[in-house]
Design a protein with these regions (language model features):
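Radical SAM enzyme [4Fe-4S]-AdoMet core and its adjacent flexible, acidic
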Residues: 1-14, 43, 63-64, 68, ...
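Hydrophobic packing within well-folded, soluble alpha/beta domains
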Residues: 48, 52-55, 88, 105, ...
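Short, flexible loop/turn elements at secondary-structure junctions
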Residues: 48, 94, 122, 190-192
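Residue-level recognition of short loop/turn positions
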Residues: 51, 93, 120, 292-293
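Short loop/turn motifs at secondary-structure junctions
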Residues: 51, 84-85, 136, 211-212, ...
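Conserved Radical SAM active-site core
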Residues: 62-119, 123-136
Length: 370
């Protein structure tokens, strides 16, 4: 299957200057602390309109009062843009489109030179967002985890009516994008689960033929160690029952529609720990996570862990937080104390970490034969 959008890999190799700075620093914290993240995930709000059965951040609590104020975010964006942050994904522990000033935030993000993306359930995607923010957005990935209203409602723990609402919202977005010749990629992502495995082909047809989206991603579940839910903790992607439709999904591809069935990532879920990296070199260097209550973290899979929290944008500027003493201690902790065998398997930075570990530890065979 085609991976036109690089979904089942990483793009750090296209940032050689940043990679060179990491290699040249040689674990010198005084040098590493000067490297700003390439990518930041921002949670505009803590509230969410769904309670997905696989949600990794259920332990945060979906706090409706947690919200980044627009004026604070504008200041943070100027700081990030002037210090080399290149991209922001609005997602997080809540549903980003619920934020009432999200369109103003998106416009400001693009204004300061930062690329914009969204991961959303798209229930709250309205005409105002489509007409104002699509033009500033590089891509939108919609979490849609059922091929029927019944299974969708079961997995998302919402009303069945939301299934058709999301389809209609996406159709509007694609039509507006095409009519106005906007450069915004629109795709759908599903977590492969026992409840929806038999419906993935049907969902793929809806995405391709009814919605007209650009791609469909089918990815494995990954247990977040801190999550309250343990429903899929023992899921086994070596099962042919779960993966029976892989070839039929591949057959859905066309020139304008791509399917990314993340079989490699599924295999990694059951990989021998001895083959994994033993140091997380991407954290807290190349990405940051901004919680809805304002805290800045170096890793999205260690939220509420003080070893990964460096400060709060409601109390200090982003630069003050990122170059502060708490992050300095955080870098030292990751390099010297973090046991990655206890981290989430297939985390957001997994492919980046594999790449960096091979570079740092010299694990690439015949590297000079380019």
């Amino acid at each position: 299957m085609s991976d036109k959008f690089g979904i089942d890999g990483h793009k750090l190799a296209y940032h050689p200057v940043e990679v060179a700075r990491l290699l040249e620093a040689e674990n010198d914290v005084s040098k590493l602390i000067d490297i700003y993240p390439i990518y930041v995930e921002v949670s505009p709000v803590g509230a969410c309109n769904h309670r997905c059965t696989f949600c990794a951040v259920d332990y945060i609590g979906y706090e409706a009062t947690n919200r980044i104020e627009a004026d604070v975010m504008m200041r943070v964006l100027e700081d990030m843009g002037s210090n080399g942050v290149k991209s922001i994904m609005y997602a997080g522990e809540g549903e980003p489109l619920i934020h009432k000033q999200i369109n103003e935030i998106v416009a400001k993000t693009k204004e300061v030179g930062i690329d914009v993306s969204f991961t959303t359930n798209a229930v709250a995607m309205n005409d105002r967002f489509i007409e104002n923010s699509l033009q500033h957005t590089s891509w939108i990935k919609v979490s849609l985890n059922g091929g029927s209203a019944k299974s969708y409602a079961q997995v998302h723990q919402t009303r069945e009516i939301d299934f058709q609402r999301v389809i209609n919202n996406l159709k509007k977005a694609v039509e507006f994008r095409n009519k106005n010749k906007l450069n915004c990629t629109i795709g759908v992502q599903s977590v492969l689960l026992p409840e929806n495995a038999d419906e993935m082909v049907n969902l793929g047809k809806i995405i391709r033929d009814e919605i007209g989206a650009d791609y469909f991603v089918i990815k494995p579940f990954s247990q977040e160690p801190s999550s309250i839910n343990r429903l899929y903790e023992d899921i086994d992607y070596r099962s042919m029952t779960l993966r029976a439709n892989e070839k039929r999904l591949k057959a859905l591809e066309s020139e304008n529609f791509k399917v990314s069935y993340r079989s490699g990532t599924m295999s990694n879920y059951h990989e021998d720990q001895e083959n994994r990296y033993t140091t997380c070199y991407s954290t807290p260097i190349y990405m940051a996570y901004l919680m809805a209550e304002g805290s800045v973290y170096g890793c999205k899979d260690h939220l509420l862990d003080p070893n990964f929290c460096y400060g709060n944008i409601n109390e200090n500027t982003f630069s003050e937080v990122w170059k502060g003493e708490r992050r300095r201690r955080g870098i030292e902790y990751v390099l010297n104390e973090l046991d990655v065998s206890k981290c989430r398997i297939n985390c957001r930075m997994d492919k980046v970490n594999r790449y960096l570990f091979d570079l740092k530890e010299g694990r690439i065979n015949h590297m000079n034969f380019i």
